[in-house]
Amino acid sequence: ITCLPYRRQRLVLFAALSHPLAQKSQLSLKQLEGQEFVLREQGSTTRRVFEHALKQADVRIRVSLEMGSREAVREAVAQGLGLGIVADTAYVADPRLRAIGLTGPELYTHAHIICLKERKNARLLAHFLSLADTMKDPG
C-alpha cells in the first residue's frame, strides 16, 4: 500500500444561531469548559483529535449526544442540542448555524490518498495522483 499525505484539515467549532456562543467569532478551548457537545462516535478521528486537545488543556465538556455521521451532528446542533466540531473541509454552510474559530493549539486532522503500490503507476491512477499533487497542501 502507498499512502500519500494530501491535506491538513483544521477543526471548526459550530453552533446553532440561538446558542449564546454563536455570537463569538473566536473561542479558546478554555471557554468550552462545561459546554454540551454533539460529537461523532468513539473512534472518529475528529473526535479523537478534539478530545486530546481538551485533555491537554484540562478542559471538560459534556457530551449530550453521539452521532454516526457529520450530517446527523449538523442537524442535532441546528436543533440546539449542543455545539459541534468538524474538519473545515466537512463544514457545510447552513443558515441555522455559525462557524466559530478556535484559538490556541493547532487542531488538525490529516487526509491521505491511499492506493495499492502495484497500481500507483497505472495510467489513470498516475494521472489522478499527479492532479491531486497539484491540489495538495504545500509543505
Locate predicted features.
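Short secondary-structure boundary segments
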Residues: 17, 87-90, 111
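Generic preference for hydrophobic
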Residues: 3, 13-14, 37, 85, ...
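A late-sequence structural motif
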Residues: 22, 100-139
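A ligand-binding cleft/hinge motif common to bilobed small-molecule-binding domains
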Residues: 49-52, 56, 70-98
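Short beta-strand-centered segments that line the small-molecule binding cleft or hinge
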Residues: 1-15, 73, 78-81, 97-100
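Secondary-structure junction motif
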Residues: 21-22, 36-57, 121-129, 138-139
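Short beta-strand-to-loop elements that line the ligand-binding cleft
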Residues: 59-69
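Flexible hinge/capping segments at coil-to-helix
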Residues: 1-37
